[in-house]
Amino acid sequence: HRNIEHILTLADLQNIENVPKEQGAILLLFHMGNWEILTKMHELIPNENPVGGMYRPLKNPLIDNHVKKQRESGGSQLFSRKRGLIMAQKFLKKGGFLGILCDQYSGRAGLKTKLFGAESSITPLPAILALKHQCPVIPVTLETLSPGRWEMRFHKPIQLSPQIDKVEATHLLVKVMENIMHTYSRDIFWLHD
């Protein structure tokens, strides 16, 4: 923690601190700012809840093992999007905060929807897991304050109604994504389609 506190400030921590210890949360993450610092979130937040994330394994297993080890060195736990979904759900049930990068093109596995008016494929996973486990979705942003300094902001939690389905819930989260991507456009690293 001491290694990064001089380059990173935290904002609106109450939005994550107020999540009950026994309840998990979905952290809606973006490729923005210094996004690799998200793997150090476990060291940064005062909650006792474990922090983990879904990740896409790299094709080269040697490089993948090295990168995964580096990312998990801060105490976060990573779950492969190909084989780790069951473990990720158990993690969430035990009160874990599960980070999911929501801004990647999801291909055939994604939900076809409009993003900034253009047809796109978005992962429905944050919506599916939030609905299934009735846990909040907390958007997390990394804004560049100056060269080499960032602010990690925990936005207001979104509690999805159990009366809506994954399609409606994903559309709702896409609106949140659009707002964040518009607000923080200089920090977003986003190449879709």
What are these regions (language model features)?
Residues 2-25, 33:
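A short, well-structured juxtamembrane/interface segment
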Residues 4, 55, 76, 114, ...:
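Conserved short-loop catalytic and cofactor-binding motifs
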Residues 5, 32-33, 50-53, 90-92, ...:
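Short acidic/polar alpha-helix capping motifs at helix-coil junctions
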Residues 6-10, 60, 78-81, 119-120, ...:
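A conditional alpha-helix N-cap/helix-loop micro-motif detector
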Residues 12-18, 62, 66, 87:
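Exposed alpha-helical structural elements
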Residues 14, 33-36, 125-128:
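Active-site phosphate/pyrophosphate-handling residues
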Residues 19-22, 44, 48, 82-193:
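Non-catalytic C-terminal accessory region of glycerolipid acyltransferases
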Residues 23-82, 108-111:
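Catalytic core of membrane glycerolipid acyltransferases/transacylases, capturing the structured
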